[in-house]
Amino acid sequence: MPVLHNRISNKELKARMLAETQPRTTISFYKYFNILNPLDFRNSLYQQFTDLSVFGRVYIAKEGINAQISLPTHNLEAFKALLYSVDPALDNLRLNIALDDDGKSFWVLRMKVRDRVVADGIDDETFDPSKTGEYLKAEQVNQMLDNPDTLFVDMRNHYEYEVGHFENAIEVPSDTFREQLPMVAEMLQDNKDKNIVMYCTGGIRCEKASAYMLHNGFKNVYHVEGGIIEYARKAREQGLPVRFVGKNFVFDERMGERISDDVIAHCHQCGVSCDSHTNCKNEGCHLLFIQCPECATKFEGCCSEMCREEVRLPETEQRARRAGRENGAKIFNKSRHRLQDGLNSTSLQSVE
């Protein structure tokens, strides 16, 4: 029986990926459709994806599939043929090709079965996710941005919005999609006569959000087809003004795609203009924050003095402390809230 999960260490896999000389292409895709047996579906796909040297993150649920992957560029056409043949619902599925890609986005294939492909927290039997808002193509997006009766709503996390967003877009200040859904319906309760345009990175969150808004009585609901990635690609191809400002955060090793030259965020430690996310080098912390090159040097890639001191300890001692043998789980504060504490303030959001 073939092995249907990885058995090689992350360290070795990453080293192999970095040593690769063949070009790789990073793509993302999703589809809401009915999967009767997600585990069987997953196991079949895992072997076929492995045969094509696919790396990345794939979530499968009864409601569909959500994937961010990379693969050797010469395997792209074979991958399309495979994906389109898996189920009629996936025939000619749109693939979002990364905008700013060095091919080093992933180094291992992780394919998981989940309850939902996007954790939405919706527990309402009357909710129909197939009743979604209207798609907007790039030219229509730009027209809507100039319409005073239209509100653009960013359905991404706060740290994504911080480094880039559409002009005048509304932020729904939360760390999770499940929190955002009821929040945005409440925030816009007095704007049901407006056009509501929802967007996210690749389309999967805003598609479900548009259905949620319609379910809650909003009438004129739209979502950006293919999300930020497809919008920026089509706008460039068609010679349209790109109205997304800054960087598009992505959940892989790149941590961002440059959409415009604007840098709209600031280093969380010193406040200088910067939009480069990193994870704290302390493995017991691993917090996501924005850090400029100067602070990266000063703090040795860490979010605080405490974490810098931690990474200087022998590795065996660090592992013991992470296991809680010395001070338990309170050694590091993994709060999701930002701290404003002088030089060492940081956004304490972990990518998990």
Curated annotation (Swiss-Prot):
Domain Rhodanese span(s) in chain numbering: 146-240
Sequence ranges of Polar residues compositional bias: 342-352
Signal peptide residues on this chain, from the entry's feature table: none
SUPFAM superfamilies in the cross-refs: Rhodanese/Cell cycle control phosphatase
Region spans: Disordered: 315-352
Keyword Ribosomal protein: no
A GO term for molecular function: oxidoreductase activity, acting on paired donors, with incorporation or reduction of molecular oxygen
Disulfide bonds: none
Active-site positions on this chain: 200 (cysteine persulfide intermediate)
GO annotation, biological process: tRNA modification
Coiled-coil parts of chain: none
Catalytic activity entry: uridine(34) in tRNA + AH2 + O2 = 5-hydroxyuridine(34) in tRNA + A + H2O
Entry EC no(s): 1.14.-.-
Alphabetized InterPro entries for the sequence: Rhodanese-like_dom (IPR001763), Rhodanese-like_dom_sf (IPR036873), Rhodanese_C (IPR022111), TrhO (IPR020936), TRHO_N (IPR040503)
UniProt similarity note: Belongs to the TrhO family.
Protein name: tRNA uridine(34) hydroxylase
Phylogenetic lineage: Bacteria, Pseudomonadati, Pseudomonadota, Gammaproteobacteria, Enterobacterales
Gene coding for it: trhO
